[in-house]
Amino acid sequence: MTTLFISDLHLTPSRPDITECFITFMRTEAKNAEALYVLGDLFEFWVGDDDKTPFANQIRTEFKALTDQGVPVFFIQGNRDFLLGERFCKETGITLLDDVCTIDLYGTKAVILHGDTLCIDDVEYQKFRKTVHQPWLQWIFKRIPWYLKKKIVSKVQSDIRDDKQMKSLDIMDVNQSEVEKVMSQNCVNLMIHGHTHRPNTHFFDANGAKNTRIVLGDWYTQGSVLQVNSDGFELQNRPFNT
């Protein structure tokens, strides 16, 4: 059996090629998996669980079909879908995990997370993240009419794009010391995350041991899937239909 990991799909109605690749993935290899982990940024931006647009319902349907077949699906919120909550999970049968979570992968303990919390050199983003994760602010936002939330989110998206253009690539990558700290705190030698859109496997010595950090890829130009089984792991691409 194989456990699958994906992240940073950034699903949106304006990119039907990504959606088509995702649906194909869900209806073929995902249905044969032992488990599926989605490590954040499934959506380009998730306004709230009250989103009942045809597109949102289409994605709900795919997850519900998969969990109904007995495949467990686990979800960690990303920086673009941190408002995805228990209502969505109840409707689809998926399980919402903590921001940082440890799991057993065929006898190897691993820590999994979206990855944005590792980018501590981006001080402004970390301040923004701390603000939008305030429970009182989310409580208020969830009670705003959906159409108004959509307008607010569109403005935030525009500001984020402008902000990214002003930042260096190094600042938006993970901080190695923070990586080692999180791995040490969780007593693991394997980390899996997304967020940075820099798919790769990093091997390094730290905390008196050999460590591995696997970075999942984004789905902007092709799909990216991490396959893990008892024999090891492989980070693979999935081409879009042309």
From Swiss-Prot:
Coiled coil: none annotated. Keywords: Cell inner membrane, Cell membrane, Hydrolase, Lipid A biosynthesis, Lipid biosynthesis, Lipid metabolism, Manganese, Membrane, Metal-binding. It catalyses: UDP-2-N,3-O-bis[(3R)-3-hydroxytetradecanoyl]-alpha-D-glucosamine + H2O = 2-N,3-O-bis[(3R)-3-hydroxytetradecanoyl]-alpha-D-glucosaminyl 1-phosphate + UMP + 2 H(+). Mn(2+) 2 binds at residues 41, 79, 114, 195. GO terms for cellular component: cytoplasm; extrinsic component of plasma membrane. InterPro entries: Calcineurin-like_PHP_ApaH, LpxH-like, Metallo-depent_PP-like, UDP-diacylglucosamine_Hdrlase. Binds 2 Mn(2+) ions per subunit in a binuclear metal center. One of its GO terms (molecular function) is manganese ion binding. Its main location: membrane. It is found in: Cell inner membrane. Belongs to the LpxH family. NCBIfam families: lipid_A_lpxH (TIGR01854), PRK05340.1 (NF003743). Hydrolyzes the pyrophosphate bond of UDP-2,3-diacylglucosamine to yield 2,3-diacylglucosamine 1-phosphate (lipid X) and UMP by catalyzing the attack of water at the alpha-P atom. Involved in the biosynthesis of lipid A, a phosphorylated glycolipid that anchors the lipopolysaccharide to the outer membrane of the cell. This is UDP-2,3-diacylglucosamine hydrolase.
